């Protein structure tokens, strides 16, 4: 993962309305193993975060100036340190206007992954811990806590440059439960939501369920294809990459690589060719399975509490909306 430029600034602020004090670094960080490890760990932590949103820049204006400064940097009108300096000064101003905001170290990193250029911006905090030194004494130790990553964004610079119609070249961490704590950071990035990741993922899973039903697949084949979808989508989220419908279709059915893709297009589900899969929604699609004494049961996890009710005390399942094929067999048996 080549790192083109990287710099860290510090904004000292407590969430009590006190002024935000900026401690800006003048020069970029030099290349080192520590920087590479930091970026790798940051990417892993960011990709694993649930509840991210995707979007695109507001039009450049005084309220949303970051995209203009970023364009100046990419066109070599500003160097990276100068770009990060005006950006962090703007963030400092927004922090002062938000009483709930807390300061920290602000990381700006321009790096390349494959053939794609990204800009990562993250607010990092320290955690207190302990370490054992060379004299075998236990001493206090501070470290960057990437497990508590709450404010961060990643801009796909290549997508922004090459696809003017894209509405998902920015991803950012949303506040939990609709909290407004992170609004100032989204305004700093100047991002408006363009793609509903959870909604798109639910639509994809609905399309897949409809496809499996229309194909009238045996239970084992349906289970294998479901696992293929979940594994592929989960891998893409870990990599920070979108789910590509054509690639997914070819994985689901190697003999008919366009079958699922054509099903989506013919039924007009309204899905984009690439969608940012939502990890939380994917986890709800995993299957529960079990066999015992001639009985085989398998259902998708998201049906629990809806079409499938579990009574733990009685040890029973109540299934609503039985498959038509099963109902017909039961009726014939009764007759």
UniProtKB/Swiss-Prot annotation:
InterPro entries: Nucleoid_associated_NdpA (IPR007358). GO terms for cellular component: bacterial nucleoid; cytoplasm. The keyword Cytoplasm applies. The keyword Cell cycle does not apply. Its main location: cytoplasm. It is found in: Cytoplasm, Nucleoid. GO terms for molecular function: double-stranded DNA binding; single-stranded RNA binding. Keywords: Cytoplasm. Belongs to the YejK family. This is Nucleoid-associated protein PputW619_4243. It comes from Pseudomonas putida (strain W619).
